[in-house]
């Protein structure tokens, strides 16, 4: 096998490899990460939890400005390219620039001792992608071993990669200015050559989200919904999917002791049902506590990999310390969560589709039931809002409209994802709900306890029996009471001492929705959806 891997690397331009560490065990990776001679960002540190912690330097998140896709015959008419009217992260790269950065990365990886991980992206055999990740850094190999689906011995014996990720995080591009790139760092994709190149950034998530962007290209073209969501399944086989941007509660709310986890971030939905793309979870750890998120807290043990957390001198972790970044993370193999779908992370068709939003404006209700038209409207809008800054007195919310709750990872036009999703929902008779995990008129965030109560009411069907009212401006159907949920919060107007305050904020937010949706009003279908949005 090693000879074959070496030959395949040589075909990519990676030559004179000193040694190939092929699909190492967790034990082996631990020893590699703990080597005393390691320096800088290669160095792992053992924590009292048993998990290894690493730092990724200035790159504590993705570098969307450094993302490029090679423009060629195959991609010119399919990719949703960035434009002056609608900006996105899919910037075109020329063939000649690609050749030049490919040489940089292959030169960097040549004459080295390399880690090669072969794994799958996609739990469904019909549509899964065989991925090979090549890196010179042990913990990066550990990260992808955690995050992708680990093949069996038999699958490895016949493994032929469909796609290769070459991680050259130690190399930067000196010619970036002449080539019209954003910086010396790059995250580039060649869909025709089936290769991803990484240079300059050490952030682990570039490998995970890179493959997600590719699944988002290939699968919808085959009629399979590709979704930035978490998913779980109840005892009766009822499947729920939770869409949402980072920090809205996807991982937290789908990790539920009463239901089995399918996955926490990326899924497909085909003729057989919903399936995970990944073999692990990548959870945020800022302010993590055993009390609020017991399953995630307990998943942080040997074989988990922490990124950018603050480790105290005694090796314990200070989860509340966001001094390196608010985006502290842990990756772990999915089986670190007790309650998962086994042996394959897939289940039947979804009957509940939940859109999570964290509305910092304090306008949206904690839960509303959507009509089919509203489902399309709120899916394409992909709204959430953050509270800016941690300085005292600065509480100005910043709205984010991210198409399909994952604009950064969409390789095709957003309407293609909406179309496939709605088709799948219609076929399974799925209902959609908008759940606000953010703030209300009290100035406080809606409690996890109330949000869990809302999710329970959606999943056990009690929301269907609730008497409904309507929220003006947004025309959303809201329940008047739900078991286990504080009734005072269900209508957001009731959380304000003065309802006129809600009205003013609601008009402001509605205006932002209307403005954002103008980009979809370029055809008849888009124009027809405007009626499902807020009315001023």
Curated annotation (Swiss-Prot):
The keyword Nucleotide-binding applies. It catalyses: oxaloacetate + ATP = phosphoenolpyruvate + ADP + CO2. Mn(2+) binds at residues 209, 228, 265. Pfam families: PEPCK_ATP (PF01293). Its EC number is 4.1.1.49. Involved in the gluconeogenesis. Catalyzes the conversion of oxaloacetate (OAA) to phosphoenolpyruvate (PEP) through direct phosphoryl transfer between the nucleoside triphosphate and OAA. HAMAP family: PEPCK_ATP. This is Phosphoenolpyruvate carboxykinase (ATP). It comes from Glaesserella parasuis serovar 5 (strain SH0165). The gene is pckA.
